Swiss-Prot record:
Region ranges (Disordered): 410-437
Organism placement in taxonomy: Bacteria, Pseudomonadati, Pseudomonadota, Betaproteobacteria, Nitrosomonadales
Protein name: Tol-Pal system protein TolB
A UniProt-annotated Pfam family: PD40
Subunit structure: The Tol-Pal system is composed of five core proteins: the inner membrane proteins TolA, TolQ and TolR, the periplasmic protein TolB and the outer membrane protein Pal. They form a network linking the inner and outer membranes and the peptidoglycan layer.
Keywords of the record: Cell cycle, Cell division, Periplasm, Signal
GO biological process: cell division; protein import
Subcellular location: Periplasm
Lineage top rank: taxon: Bacteria
Stored HAMAP family: TolB
Main function: Part of the Tol-Pal system, which plays a role in outer membrane invagination during cell division and is important for maintaining outer membrane integrity.
One Gene Ontology term, aspect cellular component: periplasmic space
UniProt-listed Gene3D superfamilies: TolB, C-terminal domain (2.120.10.30), TolB, N-terminal domain (3.40.50.10070)
Similarity section: Belongs to the TolB family.
Length: 437
């Protein structure tokens, strides 16, 4: 995380700034509220019909969650089913849905079975072709219904767009409540927020392991920045970078075996490679400036990072192997301040924070063309993080002096705001795709 415009833009001021990010704020509620702004072009009209048996589920109903998931992307136009209630393909009158303007139709059942379980069966239909596009069948416990709804939305999203859905993923972020800092993990829609660790000293830079089972982060609990890795299921953790001086900015290698970290153990802040258990220290960068905020390419061959070696904070790329004699290639040339790079999941570009005048905005740059696209028009954006399908970027911003989380589509057309009623939220990180157990 880097300074906002109201703070010093000098890289050397990073460590001091971190202590003053949340000086004054009110207690926050755990649940995130979502507001959606804008919509993508050529939205797909889809109808989600309330499932048979869903009326008995009450607040655990599936279709409201599915509809909300799809609507947040800006890619879908939800068609009101009106009084039409088919639950099986033989009950569907396709001309009626054509008249309603639906291109796709989701129908299904959610029926209680033995052991208090709920048997779910969903079909996605192509209205014009009168054919099945996909289906979802699962039996779950009542407390798993919301997760099942996200998986259904993932299926619908993938069948209609060709991209993998990310509704079943999780996000991590830091929330400040009074004098307490809490690293939390929540579902991608902001529900089911759970604290990972809490302290009265700052917690920053959460980073997900590629398999989603661990979080690396920086804690100031011992009055200095130390990098920890914590296993979410067991809540056990280990200090993996606690060298003399500053330890910060952890980034996982794609295979989960290594971490890139920023250390000042040899003087100025430089990027090092360590094993995920803290061993095997290896220096990656050697410059007269400050090198920080590393991000691995999806194939693990390169890192991009922020450095002021040229006189202003800019983004560079260099190979991971080859020793400190490797030459770093400068990537950003528009403006005097470009920071916080993160590779796109396909490796074809990266997101970062670009300063234009007094505004710090989320941007995307393409490796092949060098073209830069600004995605936001707010003033105090920071910490961008790609969704695992590359279609959205999660980031922190400020509204009326309070930190909130927002997400913007990679084309800039749709934005969603995730906020608590009060409080201050920062340091977002979008987790990887969740693997089926």
């Amino acid at each position: 995380m880097l300074p906002t415009p109201s703070r010093s833009h000098k890289l050397s001021g990073y460590a001091a700034v971190l202590f003053f990010l949340w000086l004054v704020c009110s207690p926050a509620q755990a649940a995130l509220n979502i507001e959606i702004f804008g919509g993508g072009a050529n939205q797909i009209p889809v109808a989600i019909v309330p499932f048979s048996g869903e009326e008995g589920l009450g607040a655990q109903s599936l279709t409201p969650v599915i509809s909300a998931d799809l609507q947040r992307t800006g890619l879908f136009k939800l068609v009101d089913p009106g009084g039409l209630r088919p639950h099986e393909p033989v009950e569907v009158s396709f001309p009626d849905w054509i008249n309603r303007g639906a291109s796709a139709l989701a129908i299904g059942t959610a029926i209680p079975v033995s052991g208090g379980q709920i048997s779910i069966r969903v079909r996605l239909l192509d209205v014009a072709r009168q054919a099945e596009l996909g289906s979802y069948v699962e039996t779950v416990a009542p407390e798993q219904l919301r997760a099942a709804a996200h998986r259904i939305a993932d299926m619908i999203y993938e069948k209609l767009t060709g991209d993998v859905g990310v509704f079943s993923t999780r996000i991590a972020y830091v929330i400040k409540q009074g004098k307490k800092y809490s690293l939390q993990v929540a579902d991608a829609d902001g529900f089911n927020a759970q604290p990972v660790i809490e302290y009265t000293e700052p917690i920053i830079s959460p980073a997900w392991s590629p398999d989603g089972t661990r979080l690396a982060y920086v804690s100031f609990e011992n009055k200095k920045p130390v990098v920890y890795v914590q296993t979410l299921a067991t809540r056990t953790r280990k200090a993996v970078a606690n060298f003399r001086g500053s330890n910060s900015a952890p980034a996982w290698s794609p295979d989960g075996r290594k971490l890139a970290v920023v250390l000042s153990v040899m003087g100025g802040s430089q990027i090092f490679l360590i094993n995920s258990d803290g061993g095997g220290l290896q220096r990656l960068t050697q410059s007269s400036g400050i090198d920080t905020e590393p991000s691995f390419s999806p194939d693990g061959r390169y890192i991009i990072f922020t450095s002021d070696r040229g006189g202003s904070p800019q983004i560079y790329r260099m190979p991971v192997t080859g020793g400190v004699s490797k030459v770093a290639e400068r990537l950003t040339f528009e403006g005097s301040y470009n920071v916080s790079p993160r590779y796109s999941p396909d490796g074809k570009g990266f997101t970062f924070i670009h300063r234009s005048g007094d505004r710090f905005n989320v941007a995307i740059q393409d490796f092949a063309t060098g073209q830069v696209r600004l995605l936001t028009d707010s003033r105090f954006d920071e910490s961008p993080s790609f969704a695992p399908n590359g279609r959205m970027v999660l980031y922190a911003t400020e509204i009326r002096g309070r930190g909130i989380l927002s997400a913007v589509s990679s084309d800039g057309r749709t934005r969603q705001q995730l906020s608590t009623q009060t409080g201050d939220i920062r340091e977002p990180a979008w987790g990887p795709l969740r693997r089926l157990q």
